[in-house]
Design a protein with these regions (language model features):
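Juxta-kinase regulatory segment immediately upstream of eukaryotic protein kinase catalytic domains
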Residues: 2-44
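Helix-rich C-terminal or lid/interface subdomains of diverse kinases
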Residues: 155, 300-368
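Conserved ATP-binding subdomain of kinase catalytic cores across diverse folds
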Residues: 46-196, 270-271, 311
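Short acidic (Asp/Glu) and glycine-rich catalytic loops that position anionic groups and cofactors
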Residues: 4-5, 254-258, 272-279
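Active-site acidic catalytic loop and adjacent metal/ATP-binding pocket
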Residues: 51-69, 77, 224-270
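Active-site activation/catalytic loop segments of kinase-like enzymes and analogous catalytic loops
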Residues: 102, 264, 270-306, 322-343
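ATP-dependent phospho-/nucleotidyl transfer catalytic cores
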Residues: 140-242, 343-368
């Protein structure tokens, strides 16, 4: 199956659902080898999915009508830049979109977990307008960010994450990959993240201040100044990290894990993905008391790949990660008032999970 270049093919990128025409869909399906000669696309309908969850792209399901019998997919998914100005600004500043396109083209075929098939993609070189056309995998069992992940599912996802990290662990290929998948310590993050934090924290205090654990209230004043040190701490051992390893990007095909959304891929310590996943994708009541167990499960799996682990250093890094990853909840609070009800619930829940994870593990001590 070919992956259609949407620019060189002349089909063009999507700016809104109005651009998803029968001609465009037919070009993608035929160019990717999924539509037979003599069969055409006569109509299309769309439905938006994942609206309001505070992420960085628009996702729409496309339902084509074909002129006759075909092996072409009955539905597929398109992804293009968000229309939320706060989220788009974040994505542009941190150069997220090209990472996912590169991952699907170069890395997905060898990844240890399933990903959606890619039918077409492209990004404009002079800006961050992009489009990805992907397999619709909505029939798989999804995990849910708001409900949280069970311990049993979390253990499966952490073991599979270790398999993923092991593929690139201290790989000599990583330096050449860093022009697309930047190191976690880089000038852009050092400059942008403190600014985004400063913009988001006042909204945290306004909308969720009464909910914050007392022991971590001081994080608002100290986090921004610690960004270079935290990121530097998380540079080694180096591997390819997913960057957004959370429940809404995970599902199961039977017993087989499926992972999507590679916009935030980078290079750094694999414990980054571990801390982000545990601190924000598992509810506080389920996670509490299991942090070390889950971290050790991940490390045990790494060792099965012949990787030597300094467990004390990995635990120290875990504490740094869970402090650092509070930023996901804080920076997205800049657009809290504009979110729908689920979006607001998700932003608030992710923030509080992260903060309670910090409080439960007394993690602020590592950056104080």
């Amino acid at each position: 199956m070919a992956i259609v270049d949407l620019i060189t093919s002349g089909l063009g990128l999507l700016a809104s659902e109005k651009d998803i025409t029968p001609t465009w869909v037919e070009g993608v399906m035929r160019g990717s080898g999924n539509l037979e000669d003599g069969v055409t696309v006569t109509a299309v309908s769309t439905e938006r999915i994942g609206e309001g969850v505070g992420i960085l792209s628009i996702l729409q399901r496309v339902i084509p009508t074909y002129s006759g019998a075909t092996k072409a997919p009955k539905t597929f998914v398109v992804k293009y830049p968000t229309d939320d100005p706060v989220q788009r600004g974040t994505a542009d500043a941190l150069v997220f979109y090209i990472r996912e396109l590169t991952f699907y083209r170069d890395c997905a075929p060898s990844a240890p977990f399933k990903t959606a098939k890619c039918y077409g993609q492209a990004i404009e070189s002079e800006n961050t307008n992009f489009t990805i056309v992907m397999e619709d995998i909505s029939h798989y069992r999804p995990l849910n960010q708001l409900d949280g992940v069970s311990l049993s599912d979390a253990k499966i996802m952490l073991e599979k994450l270790a398999d993923f990290h092991a593929m690139w662990w201290n790989s000599p290929k990583l330096p050449a990959m860093q022009n697309i998948f930047p190191p976690i310590l880089n000038p852009t993050y050092e400059m942008v993240l403190p600014m985004l934090w400063a913009q988001g924290w006042p909204n945290v205090e306004k909308y969720a201040g009464h909910l914050l654990p007392d022991s971590v209230r001081g994080i608002g004043d100290i986090w921004g100044g610690k960004v270079p040190w935290m990121l530097g701490t998380l540079m080694e051992p180096m591997t390819l990290i997913h960057g957004d390893y959370r429940a809404d990007n995970m599902m199961f095909d039977g017993d087989e894990p499926v992972v999507i959304d590679y916009q935030i891929c980078g290079t750094g310590s694999g414990i980054y993905d571990v801390g982000y996943f545990i601190s924000q994708s598992i509810t506080t009541d389920v996670r509490r008391g299991h942090d070390r167990e889950l971290v050790n499960l991940y490390l045990d799996r790494l060792e099965t790949h012949g990787i030597t682990i300094d467990r004390d250093e990995m635990w120290r890094q875990y504490l740094v990660v869970i402090v650092f990853c509070v930023n996901y909840g804080v920076t997205t609070f800049g657009g809290f008032a504009e979110q729908n009800e689920r979006g607001q619930q998700l932003l608030q829940e992710m923030l509080l999970r992260a903060l309670y994870c910090v409080a439960d593990n007394d993690a602020l001590k590592v950056i104080s």
